[in-house]
Amino acid sequence: MIRRLLLIGLALLIAAPAAAAPSKIRVSLKTSEGVIVIALDMKHAPITAGNFLAYVDQKKLDGTSFYRAARAVGNPKRGFIQGGVHRDARRSLPPIAHEPTSKTGLRHLDGTISMARREPGTAMGEFFILVGAAPSMDAQPGGKGDTAGYAAFGQVVSGMPVVRRILAARTWPQGSGAMKGQLIKQQIRIIEAKRAG
């Protein structure tokens, strides 16, 4: 009888499908301005979302900051904030393969989180969050120049008022290139990054 029950139990275990990995994983960024909760899209952008999650799980984002507020010309309530390890080699993981929006199907919408990069395949621990849609950041196959766009990998699900406050932070007028006038005077600390229930 017991042997029969054990065999039935074993057969059920073998027949049961493996639990699927969640398609969305939530991450909480506790900042000096408040909490931002992000849903990472593990299904559509597994490499990029997995990379961000590695930074979270290894505590590499704890103690970093949001250091850039890039406000749109003519509409300072739109733009993006950028944060992360800011070229700190001790915190950086190896670069990842680029996942363009033309492959993932994701778009750069209000609240989208995406990876900052130089060339495709150089993204590591720098990311940005949009305030307002920015379709120009999506991949533009068939265009001229760098048409790969940026790798969107999730969406803010709570804390957009915090993101907007960071975007409105005072910036230095100095800087060079694209960063001119965008570096935050008093950087917004990322106190803790962790998985959220």
Residue ranges and their predicted role:
Residues 18-197:
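Cyclophilin-like peptidyl-prolyl cis-trans isomerases
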Residues 7-15:
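Bacterial N-terminal signal peptides
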Residues 1-6:
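Bacterial N-terminal signal peptides that target proteins for export
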